[in-house]
């Protein structure tokens, strides 16, 4: 019987060297590679396909772009998804990729699932949270063999596998429609200033246009549906906003991130559309949700973000949180106007048919509310503090 292993394949160095390793070191007869398109550059997909066709036994490329936006990015927006300032593009993509790999593995009759993640990062956990829901063996060559980037480069050359990274510029890039991450090499030193060459989606503030770009974003039930009045599908909307915001230098993050294992890591990200959509959505929520809803939802959003970052999207709690979030978003419909200028994002205005805001009630010129009615409330505001003071002064 032919022993098959299904490998989550990106076309990069790590997953490419996994192919001969799985045969030579682990004894598998065939390696089935699966690439999942969640918005990577088309050229990257083509390169991965071409490389896999040469070095794997069978290759799948699965288009999951629309599914990724609809089922993973839109829930993230509704939850104001944020982990320590990170918009979690890689985090929410991994479970979807893992599920597609499992589907292909079952179709091919594979007995094992493999990934190219290291033992120091988060992705190993995100993949395996899905992989280990099956009865198939799970293999992680990078982790199990304790491989280094330098060793992989040499090994790839020995096996005729083309590599684009070098020992001098060994940073790793992961990209999907929501974010682009750049890490590794000299970037691991938190005191190292990243060279401008690592950025592709965003212009520097210095090179951004000298005129601001104003954008109107329409939301329906917490989900963005239009830019400047033009209705767009989810993937198309995020892609277009990436271009607009990135051109104006919006959407860069350089941060120290606490990984799941407890390690601190220096990470560089680009996420133009994510920056704009999350800010606009949160602003619209303030217009339509009650104070109590906003206060409680912050707790829910934080818990949701942690589960999403950890890759635990199949946890019952994750579904419970989504149920509350979805209910809260029923009224989050309206338009937010934003200004993008040389790396800065400014909310200019917002409107909603469900706004709890009343200009008439809050206006200094309005007499709709008799200000004297507030006197009774004011007398008892801070009442317990006054009682406490009297007790302490006895």
From Swiss-Prot:
L-aspartate binds at residues 118, 122-123. Its EC number is 6.3.4.5. Its main location: cytoplasm. Pathway: Amino-acid biosynthesis; L-arginine biosynthesis; L-arginine from L-ornithine and carbamoyl phosphate: step 2/3. It is found in: Cytoplasm. The keyword Ribosomal protein does not apply. ATP binds at residues 8-16, 116. CDD domains: ASS. One of its GO terms (molecular function) is argininosuccinate synthase activity. L-citrulline binds at residues 86, 91, 122, 126, 172, 181, 257, 269. It comes from the Archaea. Belongs to the argininosuccinate synthase family. Type 1 subfamily. This is Argininosuccinate synthase. It comes from Methanosarcina acetivorans (strain ATCC 35395 / DSM 2834 / JCM 12185 / C2A).
């Amino acid at each position: 019987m032919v022993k098959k292993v299904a490998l989550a394949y990106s076309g990069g160095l790590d997953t490419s060297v996994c192919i001969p390793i799985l045969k030579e070191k682990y004894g598998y007869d065939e390696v089935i590679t699966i690439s999942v398109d969640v918005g990577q550059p088309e050229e990257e997909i083509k390169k991965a396909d071409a490389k896999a066709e040469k070095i794997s036994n069978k290759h799948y490329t699965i288009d999951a772009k629309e599914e990724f936006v609809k089922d993973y990015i839109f829930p993230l927006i509704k939850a104001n998804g944020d982990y320590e300032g990170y918009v979690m593009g890689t985090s929410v993509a991994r479970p979807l990729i893992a599920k597609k790999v499992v589907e292909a593995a079952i179709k091919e009759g594979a007995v094992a699932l493999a990934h190219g993640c290291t033992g120091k990062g988060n992705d190993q956990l995100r993949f395996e949270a899905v992989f280990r829901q099956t009865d198939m063996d799970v293999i992680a060559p990078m982790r199990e063999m304790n491989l280094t980037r330098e060793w992989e480069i040499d090994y790839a050359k020995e096996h005729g596998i083309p590599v684009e990274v070098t020992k001098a510029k060994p940073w790793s890039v992961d990209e999907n429609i929501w974010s682009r991450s750049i890490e590794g090499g000299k970037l691991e030193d938190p005191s190292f200033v990243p060279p401008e060459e690592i950025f592709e989606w965003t212009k520097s503030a210095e090179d951004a246009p000298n005129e601001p770009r104003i954008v109107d974003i329409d939301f329906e039930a917490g989900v963005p549906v239009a830019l400047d009045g033009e209705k767009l599908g989810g993937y198309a909307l995020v892609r277009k906003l990436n271009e607009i915001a990135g051109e104006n230098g919006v959407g860069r993050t350089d941060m120290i991130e606490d990984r799941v294992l407890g390690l601190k890591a220096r990470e560089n990200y680009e996420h133009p559309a994510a920056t704009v959509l999350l800010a606009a959505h949160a602003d619209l929520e303030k217009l339509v949700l009650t104070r109590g809803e906003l206060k409680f939802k912050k707790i829910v959003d934080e818990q949701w973000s942690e589960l999403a970052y950890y890759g635990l999207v199949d946890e019952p709690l994750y579904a419970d949180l989504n149920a509350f979030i979805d209910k809260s978003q029923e009224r989050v419909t309206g338009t937010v106007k934003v200004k993008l200028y040389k790396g800065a994002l400014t909310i200019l205005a917002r409107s909603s048919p469900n706004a709890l805001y009343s200009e008439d009630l809050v206006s200094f010129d309005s007499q709709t509310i008799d200000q004297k009615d507030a006197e009774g409330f004011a007398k008892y505001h801070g009442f317990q503090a006054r009682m406490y003071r009297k007790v302490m002064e006895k």
